[in-house]
């Protein structure tokens, strides 16, 4: 994959891609995300990293057009984690869950051509183990005792 692209955001709200030396749109940034191209967006005034803010703008545009990914209830539940004792744990949980989902999506696509039933069984077992580990982490973070699990061989 290519090196990290730097995009500058100027006070006039325009985005400038320093790699291709031209102004780009949020749709272009979305294309970078979809292609897996690493990038950072920097505020031109002070070089602060505003990548998350730009990604949230893209998500907002996606959510307002077409079929939304998040329900209002789901968004409200996520907001309730801000400032709480489990905010960091919840963030790691979401990131781990998304990473797992993406990896499994790739594995399923690749493996279904070989042995569909064996693949689904193996992924299901792996999924159960990962969810159990994440549940244990949440319980520990909340201060509940967690009994050690026996790992299947």
UniProtKB/Swiss-Prot annotation:
Organism superkingdom: Bacteria
InterPro entries named among the record's database cross-references: PHA_DNA-bd_N (IPR012909), PHA_reg_PhaR (IPR010134), PHB_accumulat (IPR007897)
Pfam families with a match to the protein in the record: PHB_acc, PHB_acc_N
An example Gene Ontology biological process: regulation of DNA-templated transcription
Official protein name in the record: Uncharacterized protein Alvin_0064
């Amino acid at each position: 994959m290519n090196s990290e692209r730097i995009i500058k955001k100027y006070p006039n709200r325009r985005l400038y891609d320093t790699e291709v030396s031209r102004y780009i749109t949020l749709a272009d940034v979305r294309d970078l995300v979809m292609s897996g191209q690493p990038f950072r967006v920097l505020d031109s005034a002070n070089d602060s990293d505003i990548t998350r803010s730009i990604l949230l703008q893209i998500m907002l545009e996606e959510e307002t057009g077409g079929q939304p990914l998040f329900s209002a209830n789901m968004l409200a539940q996520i907001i309730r984690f801000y400032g709480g004792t489990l905010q960091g744990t919840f963030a790691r949980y979401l990131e781990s869950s998304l990473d797992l989902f993406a990896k499994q999506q790739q594995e399923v696509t690749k493996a279904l051509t070989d042995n569909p039933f064996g693949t689904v069984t193996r992924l299901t077992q792996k999924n159960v183990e990962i969810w159990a580990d994440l549940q244990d982490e949440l319980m520990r973070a909340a201060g509940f005792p967690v009994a050690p699990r026996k790992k299947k061989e």
